[in-house]
């Protein structure tokens, strides 16, 4: 089967005009708290895709691969942050450790980082592409899958840079009622971090949406599908939304994936209209 590692040389900058067969690399992103993990779990049940278990983030965060390619961050600093932050770090707001340490062995991390630093000066794009696949593609290979899903929220916001680096990639932008996103984000922060109020949450959501719009314009609308979580979990567009997601990803009918969708993806699990719990009833009509 063809893998990302089979094409790890410096990529062509040709523009993808739209889906053609199953995607080998699918980025699922959004504002955060918009349903990216729900969509990734559905597609992970297919025969084709394996999802990265959590957000890898080294290709989307400040100081990550886009900043390295743009010259805003040096390769040595990137390598340091990869080893000491993205690999494993403690997040106070969630009171837990996060990072790629859960599925990337330390030996693989060191080998990939060493190769990246050795190659970057002569072939910066190829080095950035290679370290992504060196770290993450083994997940697909171990699962005998031909496609990989990465679900860092900012993948669509960074689609301009990622689209050049990975010309084979497609982007799913998961959208959700901004009021529910804001309420979920405030609840996630537990008042320990910004945003702490619904208004701050809405401002946060708006800023993220504007960044995503820039990313979509940069990569081209033909490589991005906007997918409504609200339509996916309920209503008369549920099946249509599922089908558009499946077809954009290049998948045919898949009994395992469809069975999971029918059993597990329901409005009761999506916390629709959660924002009403955070906003006094007298203000809900504003």
Please place each PLM-identified region on the residue numbering:
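A structural motif corresponding to the C-terminal end of an alpha-helix
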Residues: 138-142, 211-225
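Hydrophobic anchor at the beta1->P-loop junction of P-loop NTPases
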Residues: 28
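Extreme N-terminal, non-catalytic leader segments
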Residues: 2-25
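A conserved segment at the C-terminal end of the G1
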Residues: 37-49
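The conserved 3'-phosphoadenosine-5'-phosphosulfate
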Residues: 183-186, 192, 217-286
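Conserved phosphate-donor/acceptor-positioning beta-strand/loop module used by diverse small-molecule
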Residues: 151-154, 161-186
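A glycine- and Lys/Arg-enriched "phosphate-lid" helix/loop adjacent to the NTP-binding pocket
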Residues: 172, 181-206
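PAPS-dependent sulfation machinery
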Residues: 53-148
């Amino acid at each position: 089967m063809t893998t990302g590692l089979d094409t790890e040389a410096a990529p062509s900058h040709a523009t993808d005009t739209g889906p053609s067969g199953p995607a080998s690399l699918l980025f699922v992103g959004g504002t955060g708290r918009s349903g990216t993990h729900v969509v990734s779990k559905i597609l992970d049940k297919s025969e084709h895709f394996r999802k990265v278990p959590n957000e890898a983030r080294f290709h989307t965060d400040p100081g990550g691969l886009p900043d390295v390619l743009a010259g805003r961050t040096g390769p040595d600093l990137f390598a340091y942050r990869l080893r000491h932050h993205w690999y494993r770090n403690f997040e106070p707001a969630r009171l837990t450790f996060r990072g790629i340490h859960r599925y990337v062995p330390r030996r693989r991390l060191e080998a990939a980082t060493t190769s990246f630093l050795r190659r970057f000066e002569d072939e910066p794009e190829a080095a950035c592409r290679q370290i992504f696949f060196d770290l993450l593609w083994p997940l697909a290979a171990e699962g005998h899958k031909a496609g990989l899903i990465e679900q860092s929220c900012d993948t669509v916001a960074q689609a301009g840079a990622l689209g050049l680096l990975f010309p084979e990639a497609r982007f799913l932008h998961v959208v959700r009622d901004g009021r529910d996103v804001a309420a979920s984000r405030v609840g996630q922060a537990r008042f320990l971090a910004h945003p702490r109020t619904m208004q701050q949450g809405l401002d946060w959501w708006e800023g993220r949406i504007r960044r995503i719009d820039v990313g979509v314009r940069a990569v081209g609308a033909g490589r991005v599908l906007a997918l409504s979580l609200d339509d996916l979990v309920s209503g008369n567009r549920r099946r249509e939304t599922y089908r558009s997601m499946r077809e954009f990803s290049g998948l045919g009918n898949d009994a395992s994936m469809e069975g999971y969708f029918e059993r597990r993806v329901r409005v009761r699990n999506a916390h629709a209209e959660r924002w009403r719990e955070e906003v006094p009833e007298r203000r809900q009509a504003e």
